């Protein structure tokens, strides 16, 4: 028997109609007002031909309108494909084609980035459309796909992660059981809704009946003003965001009304945690991914220094273990992080092989390497082996390598992450040129700019004679840093 639950926003509007759902600096809407706006958007989308079961992409920056569109598509029964607004036209076109999306809803200023034979609906166009009657989904079935987000695998080929209503529901419940709920909570959404860290805030808002404050783009000064003014009580950040906020904060301190700084995007630097401790900032370090519908493990503030570098313990509905050579690893023994729970994806869109490889016996094999100490705290050693986390964005070396290898002058390419004070890590490339060909660092960077989002473009490129490989000719990315000249004077 299929598990169903009342439509989240409809139910929330019925239960707490006058409670504030969303602020955006220009105004606010109650849950009932949001519900009414969503019904109108849904009828306008129906006028364009959107139907139940359609995959509809959203290419927008954070806004109340974006929230309305996501809910409106769910009211119709469509599947929402969230698209990163930092993607190039080439990357975007590939994902739209691979997903089978039939429409794209886009901010007016982003619409010209969309290529290919797909119906584009701009926000100005949508707002002007007449309404058409459509049957709303009164219930959400737990097994149904709610959203799709693309994430690159170690092959560099992006995969669409299928996120069900059940995944989002249990992610919200797990977070509430961990962080608790307060009547006056307001979650600051300064991370993008096209990331799971942002979308999960939107889902929690309607499930909890919690207000959220939407920032179109992160602004450290504005975020601090909201926290100090007592307007928000919880915020999701990555280390680079938190560092900017602390720099702007100066000698000021956050009030006791601010109760949670949820820190993701990789382990936090020790100096940052020590500053947060000194300033009384309640930092909760987390570990999660698109495939787990946000956090699956979290470290409470009281352990932030005694368990420095740990991502904490699994959330209540979830399980986590370390496997090495098919066996559960001993404490402190590194191995693959394996997770299980109702918040874990059912698989990848159109990728049965990748799904079968990742999900075995009900457990999801993350590809991340870590260990668990004797107290059950998780420590992540390597994000997806070679994953680069730059300012909270996942950057996959193989994807960059594939672009470099498509250049006529490049014979071999290897990419790894190097430390960066601002972004945590940035990509660094090592290139072997083809004999008889000439190409400069600047030419390669310009080539990458045409095919990759800005944060994926290598910050340094070195020309080398050979790349390190093992006996089976597999690239040894962890040895690439050894190729950086000792007398470092920039790219060679």
Swiss-Prot record:
For the protein in the UniProt heading, the enzyme class is ligase
Gene Ontology terms, MF aspect: ATP binding; o-succinylbenzoate-CoA ligase activity
Keyword Lipid metabolism listed? The answer is no
Query: Known SUPFAM superfamilies for this protein?
Result: Acetyl-CoA synthetase-like
Tell me one GO biological process term. menaquinone biosynthetic process
Q: Which UniProt keywords apply?
A: ATP-binding, Ligase, Menaquinone biosynthesis, Nucleotide-binding
- By what name is this protein known? 2-succinylbenzoate--CoA ligase
